[in-house]
């Protein structure tokens, strides 16, 4: 192959990811060329003929070029009859075909890393009587690095559309006709002197074998022992640009394994992305059971590119955050069915990875699957943390636990806990325990009370029961204090502090905030439509 792009043309794209999926090598190559606005042609030479040629010359060269590349010098062909008496090949028929095609092209692609759509456009001159006919395309996400790149893509698509707008179709006996080789038309009443670029040539030839073979190979359209062709061409003024090829479509999701740095638990990017390797990838280190090959499946952090991981919630510095770890099997879906736009939408349990709260048929647990929640393990493989939700009818329970200092908080129906086993009853209520140190801080005050109110009525800091008990204790202390003073015994000096404590928590004195909270009154609704502390 020989590449002959114009040096002034934009540099060829460097793709982060290009996957050949259910397409031949040739289809894959030509699709990539078309996406970059590169056309191609074959140059045929007779083996061993020409300057510098030898018998090792294959005689066929694939030439890749863009719309700005300089084409070969045109070959002069006459518009004339084809006859055995003629010394030169000729073109015997030539007609022009016009078609109304788009004259404006717009391309736009969403760039998630920059959180913006990168767009570009291109337009072709057209007659005032023809309205603007726009074609708008949105290639895969992140396709364009900048607006100039998007405008270049729009130009490629516009040039490809213009090829359909002005074409010439002809026929003749010129054996030098080849796609991409310009020709100059002579002696034509309308197109004499025009230079055309053939886009496709169909060759038809018959041999001059004996009468028996000739009868078997008879063709009513062509004389035996002769040659004819027909072709489609475009004026040289129209840029030669390839038509965009359809990308292979992925029908449904696929599974893959997460890969990363050796001996690491997870190898993510800042933007919540990981690297994956599909089961069908062949290479040096394919997935277990995969086929070996020279490349394409390294099994580490060099595999492919970053793939985004979908989450339950995602926002600016808020949302859920659960990255699949190396070796995890993940479910991969593709935007618009494009193999080069994978997105991880979930993780899967399999024969090697069982759920942390396994239950059900053959689960070995003593419950039918009433446990749910989250269970994580340290990156070094030691220690676990979990949030368990037990939905057993009549025995609802929530548990927060970490193996570090065996620290836990349990609410509701308290039982002996196991990941696959519901143990015996230990009580009902709340339990906060740790094998290490513990402390409780409350900057505005802390109330610990054994008084229960039916139905949990009123507000969080309503402590009417505590205030009543403090008032009773205050009256008792005052009575004791008066009795002691009557007997000439020193009184209870702590009484004043008890009064201060009661006033601090009494909503009728100092135990209420009377301002607004988030624009709403801090007082609870009271009888008669008013509010009270």
Whereabouts are the PLM-identified features?
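Amphipathic alpha-helical and helix-coil boundary elements used as assembly
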Residues: 1, 9-533
């Amino acid at each position: 192959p020989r590449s002959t792009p114009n040096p002034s043309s934009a540099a060829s794209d460097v793709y982060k990811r290009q996957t050949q999926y259910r397409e031949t090598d040739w289809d894959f190559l030509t699709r990539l060329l078309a996406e970059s606005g590169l056309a191609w042609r074959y140059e045929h030479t007779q083996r061993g003929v020409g300057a510098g040629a030898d018998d090792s010359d294959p005689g066929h060269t694939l030439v890749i070029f863009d719309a700005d590349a300089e084409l070969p010098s045109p070959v002069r062909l006459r518009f004339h009859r084809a006859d055995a008496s003629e010394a030169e090949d000729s073109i015997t028929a030539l007609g022009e075909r016009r078609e109304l095609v788009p004259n404006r092209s717009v391309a736009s692609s969403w760039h998630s890393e920059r959180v913006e759509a990168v767009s570009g456009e291109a337009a072709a001159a057209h007659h005032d009587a023809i309205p603007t006919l726009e074609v708008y395309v949105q290639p895969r996400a992140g396709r364009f690095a900048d607006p100039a790149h998007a405008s270049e893509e729009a130009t490629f698509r516009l040039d490809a559309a213009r090829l359909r707008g002005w074409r010439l179709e002809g026929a003749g006996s010129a054996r030098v006709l080849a796609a991409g080789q310009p020709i100059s038309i002579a002696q034509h009443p309308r197109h004499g002197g025009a230079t055309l670029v053939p886009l496709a040539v169909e060759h038809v030839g018959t041999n001059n074998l004996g009468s028996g073979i000739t009868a078997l190979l008879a063709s009513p359209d062509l004389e035996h022992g002769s040659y004819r062709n027909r072709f489609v061409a475009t004026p040289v003024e129209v840029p030669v640009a390839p038509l965009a090829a359809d990308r292979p479509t992925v029908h449904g999701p696929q599974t893959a394994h997460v890969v990363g740095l050796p001996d690491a638990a997870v190898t993510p990017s800042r933007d919540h992305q990981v690297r994956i390797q599909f089961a069908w990838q062949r290479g040096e280190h394919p997935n277990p059971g995969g086929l070996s090959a020279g490349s394409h499946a390294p099994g580490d952090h060099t595999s492919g590119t970053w793939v985004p991981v979908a989450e339950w919630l995602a926002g600016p510095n808020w949302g859920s955050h659960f990255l699949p770890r190396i070796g995890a099997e993940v479910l991969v879906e593709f935007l618009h069915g494009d193999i080069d736009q994978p997105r991880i939408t979930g993780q899967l349990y399999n024969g090697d990875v069982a759920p942390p709260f396994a239950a059900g048929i053959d689960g070995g647990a003593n419950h039918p699957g009433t446990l749910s929640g989250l269970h994580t393990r340290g990156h070094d493989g030691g220690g676990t943390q979990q949030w368990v939700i037990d939905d057993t009818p009549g025995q609802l329970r929530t548990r927060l636990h970490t193996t570090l200092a065996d620290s836990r908080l349990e609410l509701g129906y308290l039982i002996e806990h196991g990941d696959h086993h519901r143990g015996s009853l230990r009580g009902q209520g709340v339990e906060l325990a740790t094998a290490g140190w513990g402390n409780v801080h409350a900057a505005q005050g802390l109330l610990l009370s054994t008084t229960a109110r039916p139905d949990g009525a009123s507000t969080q800091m309503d402590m009417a029961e505590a205030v009543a008990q403090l008032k009773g204790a205050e009256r008792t202390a005052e009575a004791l204090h008066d009795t002691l003073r009557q007997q000439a015994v020193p009184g209870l000096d702590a009484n004043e502090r008890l009064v201060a404590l009661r006033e601090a928590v009494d909503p009728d004195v100092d135990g209420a905030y009377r301002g607004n909270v988030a624009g709403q009154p801090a007082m609870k609704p009271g009888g008669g439509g008013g509010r009270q502390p």
